[in-house]
Amino acid sequence: MEDFEMMSAAARERGLKIIMDFVPNHSSEEHDWFVASEAREEPFTDYYIWRDRNESNPGGLPNNWLSVFRGSAWEWSETRGQFYYHAFTKEQPDLNYRNPAIRQEMIHILNFWIDKGVDGFRMDAVPFLFEDPSLRDEPVSGKTDDPEDYNYLSHIYTWNFPEVKTILAELTEFVHVKTGGSGVVMLGQS
């Protein structure tokens, strides 16, 4: 933090603005939240997307959803005895935005960095914030014959759900109110 504060002060002296990368979709599997969620410790139990085995699917996978980086988007946790969802790598479990506590956590994170003097945020992986709560299988796209390739499926249940706009509006409104509309910028990946 000391390094960041020194860099921030040096940037201000030069009239530069600081925009941080903000990835609200997932955390590391080593993050305290995930470790506690995996152990079913409250209030973190539902901070991530956990599902039981579905014995009607190969490998017991909850459904056919694919990771952006190939293969199933589900990883088995021996500790919890359930699968967790990851749109990207298994080391990056997706946060559960259907849990209101996650929304509050994101506001706390933005608040922390605004208080540290950040001038804006570039939000990454935004279209991946919500998934179909019914876990419906995604349809085959016809774009490739490789069933491990992300493009094998049409991502109608894991990408750009209408609720994404609601979350973006909530976060943007928080930043606007917090800063009095002073020009802290929010950029989102589309």
Which sequence ranges carry the predicted segments?
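Hydrophobic residues within beta-strands of alpha/beta enzymes
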Residues: F121-M123
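Acidic/aromatic-lined carbohydrate-recognition and catalytic surfaces
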Residues: M1-N111, D115, F128-S190
